[in-house]
Amino acid sequence: MSLLTEVETYVLSIVPSGPLKAEIAQRLEDVFAGKNTDLEALMEWLKTRPILSPLTKGILGFVFTLTVPSERGLQRRRFVQNALNGNGDPNNMDRAVKLYKKLKREITFHGAKEVALSYSTGALASCMGLIYNRMGTVTTEVAFGLVCATCEQIADSQHRSHRQMATITNPLIRHENRMVLASTTAKAMEQMAGSSEQAAEAMEVASQARQMVQAMRTIGTHPNSSTGLRDNLLENLQAYQNRMGVQMQRFK
């Protein structure tokens, strides 16, 4: 895997799924391919994106700044600086300085990532802030190692919370989670169906599922009533794809 592919993989792992994720992936591809060279416009676009946490925006802003060539005097952006200040905790800043000194001795992406992984997310963010604010310099490879270590830690904690969701026994939360998943699956089906005639059937199934979820939420239903809702949808989608000759096993 090339360095930029690895960076893209780690960064996208912390962006919530949805249309915005696809948009960010495209922006990253363009930046890494040297197609997008207007850093100021890129940062303005990033600043106004909804849904993303300040830290995710800060990391993306850091990656864009590392990659897009810009004039030396280009102003640093406040929203990135605020996100990468380690919550203003002096302990994070102390650890960030120690980490920075170690990173100065590293020359490879993987070496930097290994060193960084033993620090907390707050210290890693602060260290990125040091580099972003030009208070320290490291090679681009080392900076990318720091980025990927931070993303790995964030993705780990997100994964833990997803696992917790899977093991929650509260029937009301599980019921709502099934309905949310059915709704997002239906939306994805509608987007994938396109405008072909064969797609009408898939659109119909998706539309019915969304109406059903809406009705269940409006009138209030027994927590078990949503069992199998998403699985039925996925079976329908799979059957539709097989007829269309499309294989998207990974969708599940």
UniProtKB/Swiss-Prot annotation:
Disulfide bonds: none annotated. Keywords: Host nucleus, Membrane, RNA-binding, Viral matrix protein, Virion. It is found in: Virion membrane; Host nucleus. It holds the Pfam family Flu_M1. GO terms for biological process: viral budding from plasma membrane. It comes from the Viruses. A motif (Nuclear localization signal) lies at residues 101-105. Residues 165-252 are annotated as: RNP-binding. Residues 1-164 are annotated as: Membrane-binding. GO terms for cellular component: host cell nucleus; membrane; virion membrane. It is a peripheral membrane protein. SUPFAM superfamilies: Influenza virus matrix protein M1. Plays critical roles in virus replication, from virus entry and uncoating to assembly and budding of the virus particle. M1 binding to ribonucleocapsids (RNPs) in nucleus seems to inhibit viral transcription. Interaction of viral NEP with M1-RNP is thought to promote nuclear export of the complex, which is targeted to the virion assembly site at the apical plasma membrane in polarized epithelial cells. Interactions with NA and HA may bring M1, a non-raft-associated protein, into lipid rafts. Forms a continuous shell on the inner side of the lipid bilayer in virion, where it binds the RNP. Determines the virion's shape: spherical or filamentous. Clinical isolates of influenza are characterized by the presence of significant proportion of filamentous virions, whereas after multiple passage on eggs or cell culture, virions have only spherical morphology. Filamentous virions are thought to be important to infect neighboring cells, and spherical virions more suited to spread through aerosol between hosts organisms. Homodimer and homomultimer. Interacts with NEP. Binds ribonucleocapsid by both interacting with genomic RNA and NP protein. May interact with HA and NA. Cannot bind NP without genomic RNA. This is Matrix protein 1. The gene is M.
